[in-house]
Amino acid sequence: MIDTGHAALAGVDAVGLIRRHPRRVAHVHVKDVRRAVFGACQARRASFLDGVVAGMFTAPGDGDLDFEPVVRALADTRYAGWIVVEAEQDPKLADPRTMSALGLKTLRAEAAAASLVP
């Protein structure tokens, strides 16, 4: 399983993992990262939960990650499994439906460009 947000914050190259171990990628979670929020949380030694509540994660298209290389790697390795769009943030700060729609729109555009379509 690959989770783009967790991989990015851990300093893991998700694209490299996908390309090196395509048979081990059975499920993909995509979420974006707000690096400034993450950095501020690290500076104050906040907990992971505090970081989530502060908004270090967001839907694809609303943060700092580039999803084109991820989707391209999935297409190149003929990935045919689920891609789950995650919008992990406080619903009081960002409407879940709006953020989910943004994530889906972002991933659909990248998937079409990479010819990763069902």
Pin down the residues of each PLM region:
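Histidine-acidic metal/acid-base catalytic patches
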Residues: I2, A7-P118
